[in-house]
Amino acid sequence: GNDTFGFLSIETVRKYLRESEKLGVREYYFTGGEPFLNRDMMPILEETLAIGPATVLTNGTVFTPTSIRRLRDISQASSYSLELRVSIDGYNPQTNDPIRGEGTFKQAIRGVRMLVQAGFLPIITIAQTWPEQDGPGIFDSFVETLKAAGYERPRIKILPTLHLGMEEERTRPYSRSERISVEMMENYDSSQLLCSRGRTVTDRGVAVCPLLIEAPDAHLGETLEEASGAFRLSHGACHTCYVYGAI
């Protein structure tokens, strides 16, 4: 997601929810920016959860006791599940805040604590920024941090680094070799790819996937129907998705 895109109003979401029902969509996923800065987010979730399960990817920094209570009420009133994924990139302020911003670690952990107290079991998503050999130790450090915040059996998902946006400057851009070739698709289960079964609604129309909303060629139309066609897998991010599966 990206901060240069605007929030979706409830009217816009409602229009796409109606279209999605006709197309047999079975699951909904909200990302940003930060979805919970959208003042329509709670009613959007209410209307979405009336027709299917929803997942929200949040940085966890803007929750208040009031918004958590509202979330819990919305979740409990629905027959469908509400899943929350909280992005944290380090297990302490020293490792997280240089990536996410000053003070964000403390705010995110506070958000996780409130979610757990309200009965949610958030998935903590972490972009891998460390060498492979450091993985087990870092994973254990995350578990300790989350247990200390009251999350007894934390759900943790390590994500590959996407060399897009700020990450392009922080680490490196994609190399020319990080592309999908025709040969690579032979005998490959393409259902592993995000774009094989979903589309991303933005305030500028419908894009092929959330990773490529900045790419002009990834915007496929104004409706889900228009955007449902095939897409050429020509981007570096497509290669990451190919290697790691839908993220």
Residue ranges and their predicted role:
Residues 166-247:
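Accessory C-terminal segments flanking Radical SAM cores
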Residues 23-29, 51, 55, 78-88, ...:
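Conserved C-terminal portion of the radical SAM core fold
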Residues 1-2, 244:
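Cys/His-rich metal-chelating microdomains
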Residues 32, 160, 245:
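Residues that line or immediately flank small-molecule/substrate-binding pockets and catalytic motifs
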Residues 3-13, 90-98, 118-126, 144-156, ...:
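Short flexible/disordered coil segments
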